[in-house]
Regions:
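A conserved beta-strand-loop-helix scaffold within acyl/acetyltransferase catalytic domains
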Residues: 1-119, 150
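Alpha-helical elements of Rossmann-like donor-binding domains used by nucleotide-donor carbohydrate transfer enzymes
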Residues: 14-17, 126-130, 155
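Generic hydrophobic alpha-helical scaffold/packing signal
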Residues: 19, 98-99, 132, 157, ...
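Alpha-helix boundary/interfacial micro-motifs
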Residues: 49-51, 122, 156, 163-164
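Membrane-targeting and insertion segments and their boundary/processing signals
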Residues: 102-105, 130, 134
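Conserved acetyl-CoA-binding loop-helix of GNAT-fold acetyltransferases
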Residues: 119-133
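Active-site/acyl-donor-binding loops of N-acyltransferases
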Residues: 137-174
């Protein structure tokens, strides 16, 4: 996110202090992937679907088309994983993360980011969803996802709009 948005984040000590200061009210969610394991799972899933397609024969053309689309999606993932320039694909790689601070009935997602190498994986959606679920379990009624850039072509707006947000504009913002 730093490189993509041309911003500079704070150092590790700052984030450790933030998490220590807010204790149980600080939520840190991180998504990981083991690329080597993911590739094996993709190949296994692809083989299972291909077996299912073969078993269908000429019947159920709609189901066959759906299964073929799944195979195509899996093949794209395999190409993505194979193209990654990662030293050790057997180690877990961070895909995305978010830090949320809960206070009373409100919570604020104050930092979030993703590894650009895995931009085609929807991991950030799960991180945000899990963060919001946990906040709700803590009694939070409203979670702020932070701002948007005020441009309808902004990818951040596209991402956040998938959570059915209530966009609040304050005087003097735009």
């Amino acid at each position: 996110t730093e490189k993509r948005k041309n911003i500079s984040l704070r150092g590790r000590e700052y984030f450790e202090n933030l998490l220590d200061t807010f204790g149980d009210n600080a939520l840190l969610y991180i998504s990981y992937i083991n690329v080597e394991k993911a590739v094996k799972e993709c190949h296994s899933r692809k083989e299972a679907i291909e077996d299912e397609i073969e078993a269908l024969g000429e019947k159920s053309p709609k189901k066959k088309r759906t299964l073929l689309e799944q195979v195509a999606g899996i093949e794209k993932l395999i190409v993505l994983f194979d193209s990654l320039e990662i030293e050790d694909k057997s180690k877990n790689q961070v895909i995305s993360a978010a830090i949320t601070i809960a206070y009373g009935k409100h919570a604020e997602i104050i930092y979030a980011g993703m590894n650009e190498d895995f931009a085609k994986l929807p991991a950030q959606y799960k991180v945000f969803s899990d963060t919001m679920k946990k906040a709700q379990e803590m009694g939070v009624k409203e979670v702020s996802m932070g701002g948007i850039e005020g441009d309808l072509n902004d990818s951040l707006l596209g991402f956040k709009s998938k959570f059915a947000p209530n966009i609040v504009e304050y005087y003097g913002e735009f």
